Amino acid sequence: MQEHLVVTLDGKDYLVEPGTNLLEFIKSQDTFVPSICYNESMGPIQTCDTCTVEIDGKIERSCSTVIDRPMTVNTVNNDVKDAQKEALDRILEKHMLYCTVCDYNNGDCEIHNTMDAWGLQHQTYEYKEKPYEKDYGPFYRYDPNQCILCGRCVEACQDIEVNETIRIDWDREHPRVIWDNDVPINESSCVSCGQCATVCPCNAMMEVNMEGNAGYMTDTEPGSLAAMIDLTKKAEPGYGPLFAISDSEAEMRKERIKKTKTVCTYCGVGCSFEVWTKDREILKVQPSHDSPANKIATCVKGKFSWGHINSDQRLTKPLVRKNGEFHEVEWDEALNVIADNFTSIKEKYGPDALSFISSSKATNEESYLMQKLARQVIGTNNVDNCSRYCQAPATKGLFRTVGHGGDSGSIEDLEKAAMSVLIGTNTAEAHPVIASRMKRAQKLFGQKIHVFDIRKHEMAERADRFYQPKPGTDLAWLSAVTKYIIDHDLHDKAFIDEWVDDFDEYYKSLETFTMAFAEEATGIPESELIKFAEECAKAESVVICWAMGITQQDIGSDSSTAISNLLLVTGNYRRPGTGAYPLRGHNNVQGCSDMGSMPDKITGYQSIEADDIRAKFEKEYGVKLNPKAGKDNHEMVEGIHDGEVHSLYLYGEDTGIVDSNINFVQAAFEKLDFMVVQDEFLTFTATYADVVLPASPSLEKDGTFTNTERRIQRLYQALEPLGDSKPDWKIFQAIANRLGFDWNYKHPSEIMDEVARLTPLYAGVSYDRLEGFNSLQWPVQPDGTDEPILYLEGFNFDNGKAKLFPLSFDNYFKQDEIYDIHVNNGRLLEHFHEGNMTYQTPMIKYKVPRAFVEISPELAEDRGIHEGAEVKLISETGEAVLQVHVTDRVKGKEIYIPLNNDAMENGDLGAINLLTNSDVDQYTDTPSYKRTSCRLEVITKRGKSPLNPNNFRVNKKRHPQYSVQVQKKWERSDYVFPGNQVDK
């Protein structure tokens, strides 16, 4: 096989690997060729024709040319320049250059930069205005009169995000970008991911916050702006001087527009991007091809939901309760109140009378200091985080079988799999950027997607096969499928022999898991399960993703274990495109646990009960550590009711809304002797506190987050803390010092250095290695070597072998006669968790103003109710009043309630956790949120829909196509390829 081909570029020979994109090769040699429609994250679109070069004597597009033979390429001869000039002129026929007064004149307008670099002075064709007005959506706007029809937005929507809303109508006299069947943006099925604005090479598609805000003259009234544009164009003899002026203005903007790399503060995908700020105003979020987890992708929250940063609801001063009411105080007073109460409670009841809940939204460094405060300063292991509410069972299942509690590979591996299996995960709304990777792999590369869920969400609709098991019965079908694969000799015997222990004992435990048993338990027909088992066993590579639909059950740990068992039996670990992916819900829920904010584990999952581990930390901390595992979140609440816990300190967590059975939780808060809440806002939980401390959000501090794929990334401070708020790490340090310790961290990098010294999993992590968009995936060796794919050198047990774990099942789903409706619950695309941050962005709230309940058409008909009806849901533990959205996403007596309810405005009204109970997974104490039943009472039979009429759930009309369909452009009578025109 020939390894390299000779390419002669402008007279010089190069050895090039076959399959290399010609345009990318030319760019790698620092040779300029215009390429306005090309984007390295999307590949060739072929609409702009500016990248033409001469290949073996013929003018062709370099962007779509693959080097598959020796070739001679010329980028500078007259024919090439003539063809490029023709293409550039056609672009300026569609796009008016008024750079100095354009919001996009920030140094990265690709039309401006290309024309300038090429040296274009005059355009041949006069600009032609199109008969269209600007179209404004809630977050971005489209200006057809500046659009060059490059199709990047279409490619992004159709084949990167795969939301399939945007296309170009090439058939009209004046082609333009359209949404759905040519409706306004705000009436379309657009989910507002914003990637169209991200990839637009000019000001045609632009964030609303940018308009009129970026430049020194861009806020000019439209009529005056038009006059200024005309005057400027008439005054300049050519584009050279015009570009010089606009370049000077762009340089001036650098002094007022700050671009700061950060990491998204919402879900566990870990999207990174630059945030553009002017003073405190957030202009835009701009992801990069260098963003390791997301590349150029975002979702509506990461791209646009930053209203919480400057919300007038932000806390800017400490609050101390006096005579039943909160009063603003200075930090000294607040710290003294905390120190006095912590000291008195510890002296009276002992250190285990105090408890601490860490935040999965805060940085690694802050999570580390919270557990250090609990263990070193107070002397208790009563510290936990919200992974207890969702991810602990997944981690338990992986610890049992493969030894590491994290994703097996990288997000990019999900695209490489031949088959993706999604179980109990509403990926398109909870982890939309990951969902887009899978949708793209399915659409463009034939990946097979199988979805097991009780609710027909978007991924279920798109799946090659969708299965609806009875609630809480996934372990039954998972084990039956595994048994069938072994029974029919479809298992990977070579993999098992070399890499897996306990096969015989495990196989024996599967005896009762017949396909007939699985059908009876789950309701999935035996024939469908057999077909799935055979496809799964024969697929070249399989990944399984799961989330709260699995973990928030009373057998969440066992169901997670069953997933890993299936992957081991089929040999789907230790390779790209394989493995277990428990999709983490919060931006740093992985990191928070990594940092030891757990009652039985210190950093890197080292046991606090192990003498050698404690000795290491005792040497670093200078105190003796408590050898007994502490209480987890669930046990803390019970401990308050039992009189064992007297103080609670939590930060970045609205426990009084998000914990299960919140009537029980709120009653516990009332019994506390002393409670401290640290947050951006006066949350619902904070209203129970004695002291409330104002904390700074992610844009106001430095630190690191660790995402679902174990990827550690830096975030940089973009803004100063608002008012007297402080980063959490500074608050913890102040409290520790007020209690007599001498913490002296100057920067979070020093905290991470300490973590690295103590934690084998993070041994090679340093801020220098995380500079910019660089990242590391744990475990990280001292020399900085990381592991994008786990287990290549063996599983995380002493002998390097994985373990199959025997399981049993008796978790049959039974419909209660009184509480006859099963209550499912979970995330929404627009809001995050309880919604405290997302409700602060007005246009997000406009999209989904309140919580609601999804009810099936069958149940609605049975109860005589319609869209917008008001119902009371009553469970054994409480009741909630909600408005109805009738949808076929749920069936029969299944209902679905989103987690968000805007508790800061509405209190706990309509909160799902008024209905949930205190049942938990026996191994992790994770609440069985998904094991909830209720009865329904009708208050009103119809009303106004709880969803905005323009919400994409109502306007669900996808228009899938492949790319921009450029051939339709080429078929137009007014199109001639510039190379052909030159040939003529």
Swiss-Prot record:
Binding site for [4Fe-4S] cluster 1: H95, C99, C102, C109
Family: In the C-terminal section; belongs to the prokaryotic molybdopterin-containing oxidoreductase family.
Residue ranges of domain 4Fe-4S ferredoxin-type in the record: 138-165, 181-211
Cofactor: [2Fe-2S] cluster; [4Fe-4S] cluster; Mo-bis(molybdopterin guanine dinucleotide)
Family matches, as PROSITE patterns: 2FE2S_FER_2 (PS51085), 4FE4S_FER_1 (PS00198), 4FE4S_FER_2 (PS51379), 4FE4S_HC3 (PS51839), 4FE4S_MOW_BIS_MGD (PS51669), MOLYBDOPTERIN_PROK_1 (PS00551), MOLYBDOPTERIN_PROK_3 (PS00932)
Pfam family, one: Molybdopterin
Domain 4Fe-4S His(Cys)3-ligated-type: 79-119
Biological-process GO terms, alphabetical: formate metabolic process; respiratory electron transport chain
UniProt keyword annotations, A-Z: 2Fe-2S, 4Fe-4S, Iron, Iron-sulfur, Metal-binding, Molybdenum, NAD, Oxidoreductase, Repeat
Reaction(s) catalysed by this chain's protein: formate + NAD(+) = CO2 + NADH
Domain called 2Fe-2S ferredoxin-type: residue spans: 3-79
CDD domains linked: fer2, MopB_CT_Formate-Dh-Na-like, MopB_Formate-Dh-H
Keyword Iron-sulfur on entry: yes
Protein name according to UniProt: Putative formate dehydrogenase SAS2201
GO cellular component labels: membrane
Binding site for [4Fe-4S] cluster 3: C157, C190, C193, C196
Cofactor comment: Binds 1 [2Fe-2S] cluster. Binds 4 [4Fe-4S] clusters.
Domain 4Fe-4S Mo/W bis-MGD-type: 257-313
An example Gene Ontology molecular-function term: NADH dehydrogenase activity
EC supergroup of this enzyme: oxidoreductase
Ligand binding ([2Fe-2S] cluster): C37, C48, C51, C63
UniProt-listed Enzyme Commission number(s): 1.17.1.9
